[in-house]
Amino acid sequence: MDFTKEEKLLNAISKVYNEATIDDYPDLKEKLFLYSKEISEGKSVGEVSMKLSSFLGRYILKHKFGLPKSLIELQEIVSKESQVYRGWASIGIWS
């Protein structure tokens, strides 16, 4: 079964959110909940991915990579989506 981009992103966020070790990072849990809510309410996957990618990049560095593997996997997903979104946004600016 193929999943939509929304479903893939929500599944990846849920996987991180449900990790037992994430309870040690309440600020991260709060952001993950916020971004999953935005997707559920119909916000663009690209826009949410861009914001989440930026947040996760800083968060991962701040915590010296001492976070679960599922968070790194989520970062890979949102990084790809945010690059596509930024590319389309740039086309609109430069054309």
Swiss-Prot record:
Pfam families named among the record's database cross-references: EntA_Immun
Alphabetized UniProt keyword annotations: Bacteriocin immunity
GO BP, sorted A to Z: bacteriocin immunity
Protein origin, superkingdom: Bacteria
SUPFAM superfamilies for this protein: Bacteriocin immunity protein-like
Signal peptide boundaries: none
InterPro entries: LciA_Immunity-like, Ta0600-like_sf
Function: Imparts immunity to bacteriocin hiracin-JM79 to naturally sensitive host strains.
Protein name per UniProt: Hiracin-JM79 immunity factor
The species this protein was found in: Enterococcus hirae
